[in-house]
Regions:
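Noncatalytic, beta-rich nucleic-acid-contacting surfaces in large DNA/RNA-processing enzymes
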Residues: 1-480
């Protein structure tokens, strides 16, 4: 239920119960998507005690009362074919299977035409539908083609969704840590990290003595695991956990001596911040590592025994990396930033330069605005009636996420821009439909960037001013 389409549908339909979620979980699939608006309109009115519609035929009420005369599940098709059209359950199930795998071709077309004739005749003879009613019902049934859910499948999704929603509401740190640790959900891992920040969860530093392989959350904090460190092998990860279980690592020399990791693995751990608790800054740690592995290579070439502690304390003072440099290193090593946000680095912060934060677009319905955002998901959609292409895009800033729509007339103009990684600067008009808001885009610019274009000092100042990112360890927090 976390996809943008499902989230919008649930909000529009005012979904509150398990049964309602089971219905919308199926309606959002391709087979039922064309009836979503009809269901939403009727469902919202029914919640207010208003019913301004009638069933196409009384025989449909026992089958479609829960979904307000809308086909939502595969069983709806089977029941209509059997109870209304008078077909056998075997014939009805055959039609259901045909609809889920309908392909164009002379044989399929001929079979479908024969099925239609049998269905229409059965509705008229068995249930007393008029010709017009029978044709309307066939149009509904035949349009319910493509991927859809049976009710038990949709209910199982709803059950899992309710459990996850409860966990996120009451144990957000634990839940989000588990989502990230298990290869995340619908969105990328950095989207869940940013979501945790918006929930007030402190993202603690990666720490070789306190981090496990997976992420751990508790109370109002989350500790990253080492699982996303670039090129860190499973063997080395397991060895780290095994050795720190015996005793904590005293310094980087102790780590190398006991774990026996490759040089690039140790360097990546340094740049991810895992050794920041050893009293040396990252450039100094890299200098020590260079000395250890350089000495090892030299001694090995001369057939001499290597002593990893032979280089201890042999390092000059080095200036630490700026906060911006650390963020960019994290992006390279982890795939996301632990210590900051790319929008701050690029000076694309909400409320700057006349932009509207994602969390406030609901206040600008009917108005033209500009937003900055990092893309978290997108979906290209072909309009069935015209064959033209449009895009649904979800952008994120420090305040939340927002849905952006590029209608066909604009998607064609900006498809080349949307192919770039972002972040994006988007102009458009805010619209509202059934309590949901989106931005109908009219223009877009990709904020292309590279490290060479960044003013590191100014960017670091912006990162420092942006609250909620960099945290030292908190008292009482133990190893994961």
């Amino acid at each position: 239920i976390e996809s943008p389409a499902q989230t919008r549908l649930n909000k529009k339909a005012q979904v509150e119960t398990f049964e309602e979620l089971a219905i919308t979980s199926s309606l959002v699939r391709p087979a039922g998507a064309s009836y979503c608006l009809q269901f939403i309109d009727r469902h919202r009115k029914m919640k207010m005690g208003v019913r301004d519609w009638e069933f196409l035929h009384p025989s449909l009420e026992p089958i479609l009362s829960e979904t307000h005369d809308v086909c939502a599940f595969q069983e709806d098709v089977t029941k209509i074919c059997h109870h209304v059209a008078g077909l056998s359950f075997k014939q009805a199930d055959k039609i259901r299977k045909m609809m889920n795998s309908l392909h164009e071709g002379s044989v399929e077309d001929r079979l479908w035409i024969e099925t239609e004739r049998e269905f229409l005749a059965g509705c008229i003879k068995n249930s007393g539908l008029t010709v017009e009613q029978a044709r309307e019902l066939w149009m509904r049934v035949s349009s319910f083609t493509g991927f859809s859910f049976c009710k038990s499948h949709s209910a199982s999704y709803a059950q899992l969704s309710f459990k996850c929603t409860y966990l996120k509401a009451h144990y957000p740190a634990q839940f989000l840590a588990a989502v990230i640790s298990n290869n995340h959900g619908f969105y990328s891992k950095d989207a869940y990290i940013n979501e945790a920040r918006r929930w007030g969860i402190r993202i603690l530093p990666l720490d070789i003595n306190k981090s496990g392989i997976k992420y751990v959350g508790k109370h109002n904090w989350m500790r990253p695991g080492i699982m996303h460190v670039r090129n860190l092998t499973d063997k080395t990860s397991s060895r780290i956990v095994e050795e720190k279980g015996i005793r904590e690592f005293a310094n980087v020399e102790d780590f190398i001596s006991r774990v026996g990791a490759y040089r690039h693995e140790v360097e990546n751990l340094v740049l991810a911040g895992a050794f920041d608790g050893f009293g040396l800054n990252q450039p100094e740690l890299l200098y020590v590592i260079d000395g250890i592995y350089g000495r090892h290579r030299s001694l090995a070439e001369n057939g001499l025994q290597f002593d990893v502690f032979g280089t201890r304390d042999r390092h000059p003072n080095h200036s630490d990396y700026s906060l911006t440099e650390k963020c960019l290193n994290e992006l390279h090593i982890l795939g996301f930033m632990l210590s900051g946000n790319i929008l701050d680095i690029l000076d694309l912060h909400p409320k700057s330069k006349g932009t509207v934060p994602a969390g406030e677009i609901a206040n600008f319905v009917g108005k033209g605005i500009k937003v900055f955002g990092w893309p978290v998901t997108e979906r290209v959609h072909t309009v069935s009636t015209t064959g033209k292409t449009m895009m649904f895009l979800t952008l994120e800033d420090q305040t939340g996420s927002m849905d952006v729509i590029f209608w066909p007339r604009n998607y064609g103009r900006f498809a080349d821009v949307l192919a770039k990684p972002g972040p994006y600067e988007v102009w458009g008009k805010v619209t509202e439909e059934w309590d949901t808001h989106c931005l109908e885009a009219v223009n877009i610019r990709s904020a292309e960037w590279s490290p060479s274009q960044i003013d590191f000092e100014l960017a670091s100042q912006r990162l420092t001013r942006s609250a909620g990112y960099v945290y030292t360890d908190l008292p009482g927090i133990v190893a994961a």
